[in-house]
């Protein structure tokens, strides 16, 4: 990947995404901020549209966390956190680098002190949704970054949170 190839950031206005955009630009990378409202109906055509731009990498910083989801919210969370990343991975060219933001919630309540190759043991719907995504990201150009982020949402939130 070279600096002429743009990096697309999905979820560019969220808690993690806006910081990723800022850091990449500070380092001199060309960044495309995606503001697409991803749905099961538009996912594959929109991903193909990204491919047509000949992007060098896609950073999936989207995510949904719902403490006590009802059935409809749970379905939405499973789609954004679990199913969408697997579709993204399968639809992008195998040569396009995909960096996916996951969570230590894949390890459940024993998340503290886990290693990257420990077995999954989610104990929440959120953790399970992140496991679904990780299992769908297969190949050398598919990277997973697990983090435990706690803080306000979006670019206009207080700058006193963990990443800023």
What does each model-found stretch correspond to?
Residues 10, 34, 61-62, 98-104, ...:
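SDR active-site strand-loop-helix element
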